[in-house]
């Protein structure tokens, strides 16, 4: 089973790796299992930059390229993912995280996240 990294995990991996748990760090470094990042995370970063809640050292495009150069794979949003979002229980209110949960369910991915609300859904969480 491959991994899907939550947005904060992607940011911490590149900017503040000391914030990652040992299990999260190990999962990110496990070359035998692919690590995906969602286009929804890229969108979330763009929104946070616009709201001045986040600043990257370079552009969003440079950040995405850096992730890809480290072996992370970009996961697009499929219509089936949005269909799943429409029926998910409202345990989690963040629309970006709800989409990540739907993607994890649809693509059979384990999610690397510190967010405990993910545990309320039928997915495997690594932290």
What do the predicted segments below correspond to?
Residues 45:
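Phosphate/NTP-binding elements of NTP-utilizing enzymes
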Residues 1-37, 51-65, 69, 107, ...:
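Short, well-structured N-terminal submotif of metal-dependent ribonuclease cores
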Residues 122-127:
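Active-site regions of enzymes building and remodeling cell-envelope glycoconjugates
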Residues 55-61, 69-114:
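Active-site neighborhoods of divalent-metal-dependent phosphate/nucleic-acid chemistry enzymes
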């Amino acid at each position: 089973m491959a991994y899907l990294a939550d947005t904060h995990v992607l940011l911490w991996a590149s900017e503040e790796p000391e914030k990652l748990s040992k299990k999260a760090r190990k999962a990110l470094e496990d070359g035998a299992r692919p690590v995906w990042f969602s286009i929804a995370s890229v969108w979330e970063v763009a929104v946070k930059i616009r709201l001045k809640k986040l600043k990257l050292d370079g552009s969003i495009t440079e950040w995405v390229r850096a992730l890809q150069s480290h072996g992370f794979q970009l996961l697009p949003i499929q219509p089936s993912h949005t269909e799943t979002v429409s029926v998910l229980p409202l345990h989690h209110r963040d629309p970006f995280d709800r989409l990540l949960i739907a993607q994890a369910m649809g693509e059979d991915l384990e999610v690397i996240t510190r967010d405990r609300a993910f545990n309320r859904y039928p997915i495997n969480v690594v932290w």
